[in-house]
Amino acid sequence: MNPTIYLSCLMVFSVFLLGKVNAENEDEFVTEKQRLFSVYGDSSVDEATKYRNIDSLVTFYDKYFTRLQLKPDLNTRAHDLLRRYKEENARVVLVDGTPAQGGFWLPLVKLLIVQLGVEIASEGVKRAIES
């Protein structure tokens, strides 16, 4: 096969794959954002559900924090809380695969993360109403 045709086909295929990956990432971002917004933005959702979704919220923020348009003070608080959460999670002692009972700081940090999630969701509602 002619090298020019081969390289052209390879380039078109590469651009197609990159566009598809970018579209999948965008879909994943929008889907997860909507799911977390429905958890933390809805006051009828119980606290247990919010606590169960903390890991998802932390993962989402780590992955997409550059795409979230938060106020600088809220962004700073989020970074600080997530850093503390990861530090406390790293200190958790597992007994037969489950965390040992006790400990004061991790539940406190989880409470603060839930409150942060609610605050970020309410900020999103305010922006949606304003625009």
UniProtKB/Swiss-Prot annotation:
Signal peptide: 1-23
Keyword Acetylation among UniProt keywords: no
Protein's GO biological process: cellular response to heat; defense response to Gram-positive bacterium; innate immune response; response to bacterium; response to heat
Expression induction: By a variety of stressful conditions including bacterial infection and heat shock.
Keywords: Immunity, Innate immunity, Secreted, Signal
Intracellular or extracellular location(s): Secreted
The keyword Secreted is assigned to this record: yes
Main location group: secreted
InterPro entries linked: Turandot
Family per record: Belongs to the Turandot family.
Name used for this protein in its record: Protein Turandot M
Natural source organism: Drosophila melanogaster (Fruit fly)
Gene that produces this protein: TotM
